[in-house]
Every structure is written in C-alpha cells, then in structure tokens.
Amino acid sequence: MILSIGEILADMIGEKIDGVTTFKAFCGGAPFNLAVNAKQSGAKVGFVGRVGNDVIGRFVTAEAQKANLDYLDIQTDDERNTTI
C-alpha cells in the first residue's frame, strides 16, 4: 500500500462572466493528488491529512471520500483553518 501523508486543501479557480468573477472549489494539495492519481493507476492507496473545522474542511473531506481510497484518515483541527 502507498500511504500519502500531508496537505489536503481547496483550489479555488476563478472565472469572469459578464464582469462578475465567480469561483469553483476543487479538492487539491500535492499529497492528496498523489494518492488519487496512484489509486486511479490501480495501486492500493491511503491518505492521512488534517483540515480545519470549517466549511472548506467539510468540503474537501466530502470530496476525498468520493475518491474511494483504500484508507482515509482526515483529522479535524478546531484551532486552524483549512488552506485554500
């Protein structure tokens, strides 16, 4: 099993339409991206990371669960915000 440990964050991609900028959030972070790509290549993969107790943290945790990794441990930190 490949175990990737590190950051999981939200990548915010902006788009300007009719003078209004909107943003879409995507789950990212190099260690998490590595885990997802390895899983898609057929490897058995786990990921361990930490997010803040905030809306972005809940978003990336929900997105990470959709990746169907073999092991997932995302801890919540009440004292820090999730990185964007």
Where are these regions (language model features)?
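Conserved N-terminal subdomain of the carbohydrate kinase-like
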Residues: 44-84
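Beta-barrel outer-membrane channel/assembly domains of diderm bacteria
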Residues: 8-12, 33-41
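Short pre-catalytic strand/loop immediately N-terminal to key active-site residues, enriched for Gly-Thr
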Residues: 18-28
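Positively charged, low-complexity intrinsically disordered leader regions
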Residues: 1-18
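Short, glycine/charged-enriched secondary-structure capping and boundary segments
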Residues: 17-20, 61-63
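Glycine-rich phosphate/pyrophosphate-binding beta-alpha loops
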Residues: 11, 29, 83
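N-terminal glycine-/serine-/threonine-rich phosphate-binding loop
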Residues: 1, 24, 36
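Conserved donor sugar-nucleotide recognition element shared by glycan-biosynthetic enzymes
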Residues: 27-31, 56
